[in-house]
Structure formats: structure tokens, C-alpha cells
């Protein structure tokens, strides 16, 4: 079977797990793709909350003092790779000190330094953000093969879907953004 041409850049798009996803880490997942190139892909799961820790508890563990009322930034299971590392997906209005944020497009940026957590705790962070612990990563051709196998749907990301929807509603909202009802999806895929 010939592999479809999936060489276009999916950076800034969403991956939506199909109902038949067998890997429990990705079942029901919505992943924001931060980087996609022919050699690799990296994304953050944006709809699986970390039950074990809140943003406030994480700030306490990192000895980051809170000034006033610390916003309750959602903390997500970002993926199974390097779960001790955190990434903040945020609106591009934030300019980090020192290192540059990875500007994904005109609506999204990502920062992986402690500075952003300190700034959020101090009330100087981005207007919109979520924190992901860990990430999802793919090697050369791996993501393209998974998409061709119908493991994932792709959709446009919007700040409203990424930052404003409740985590438990993001999968449904992402599917609905494609123009159909999530109940119409089958766990079985076919090829003509």
C-alpha cells in the first residue's frame, strides 16, 4: 500500500486520537503539535489533566514564591517522554527573559524555562497558558505512518479550543471543529 503524502508541515495543528487508539497513554488525546518536520515531531497532550499535582503545588515544590493570587494554570500530562520536564504552551504576548520562546505561529508560543513559571506566579505571565509535564515525540516518518494508519485525525488549532475549553471537552470540541459529531466516529478504519 502506498503511503499518502503527509510531508506538509503540521506545526501548530492538533492531532485527535481516533476511538480505536490502543495505547492508553494516547487514548482520547488531543495533541498540540509544537514541531513537525520530515525528521521529527513533538507535541503536547492538552486534554489529560495531571491528577497528582496542581499548579500551586508545583510552584511550592519548585520553591517559586507566589505573589498575590497565583492563577490556576492547567497542568496536563503532556506525553510519556521526559515527564520531569515542563513546557508552557501560551499566547504569544509573553516575552521571556533571556531565552526566546519557541514561536509556533501568530497565536501560540512555547517556553520551557523556569522563568515563565516565576513570571506566572508573579502575575507577569502570558494571558493564556497551560503547563504540560512531558511531551509526545516521534522519529522520522513515525507520525506520518500513524496518520496513514488512521490513528490520528488532524485539525486546525484555535486559542479558544486549546486554552478555554474544559479538558474533558477538548476531544469532542476538536472533532466537532472538523464538522461532524464525535458519535459518528468508528474505531475501525477502512481504505478504498
UniProtKB/Swiss-Prot annotation:
Spell out the disulfide connections. Answer: none
Q: Per its UniProt record, what Gene3D superfamilies does this chain match?
A: VC0467-like (3.40.1740.10)
Name one cellular component (GO) term: cytosol
| Domain of life of the source | Bacteria
Q: Which InterPro entries match?
A: AlgH-like
Family, as annotated: Belongs to the UPF0301 (AlgH) family.
PANTHER family, per database record? UNCHARACTERIZED PROTEIN YQGE, UPF0301 PROTEIN YQGE
Write the protein's name. UPF0301 protein Jann_3896
> What species is this protein from?
Jannaschia sp. (strain CCS1)
Amino acid at each position: 500500500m502506498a503511503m499518502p503524502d503527509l510531508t506538509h508541515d503540521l506545526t501548530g495543528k492538533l492531532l485527535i486520537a481516533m476511538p480505536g487508539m490502543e495505547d492508553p497513554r494516547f487514548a482520547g488525546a488531543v495533541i498540540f503539535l509544537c514541531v513537525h518536520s520530515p525528521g521529527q515531531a513533538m507535541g503536547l497532550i492538552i486534554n489529560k489533566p495531571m491528577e497528582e499535582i496542581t499548579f500551586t503545588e508545583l510552584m511550592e515544590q519548585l520553591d517559586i514564591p507566589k505573589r498575590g493570587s497565583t492563577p490556576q494554570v492547567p497542568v496536563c500530562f503532556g506525553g510519556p517522554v521526559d515527564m520531569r520536564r515542563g513546557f508552557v504552551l501560551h499566547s504569544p504576548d509573553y516575552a521571556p527573559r533571556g531565552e526566546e520562546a519557541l514561536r509556533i505561529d501568530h497565536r501560540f508560543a512555547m517556553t520551557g524555562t523556569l522563568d515563565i513559571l516565576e513570571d506566572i506566579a508573579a502575575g507577569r505571565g502570558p494571558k493564556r497558558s497551560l503547563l504540560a509535564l512531558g511531551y509526545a515525540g516521534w522519529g522520522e516518518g513515525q507520525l506520518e505512518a500513524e496518520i496513514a494508519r488512521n490513528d490520528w485525525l488532524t485539525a486546525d488549532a484555535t486559542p479558544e479550543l486549546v486554552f478555554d475549553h474544559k479538558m474533558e471537552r477538548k476531544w469532542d470540541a476538536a472533532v466537532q471543529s472538523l464538522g461532524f459529531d464525535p458519535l459518528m466516529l468508528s474505531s475501525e478504519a477502512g481504505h478504498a
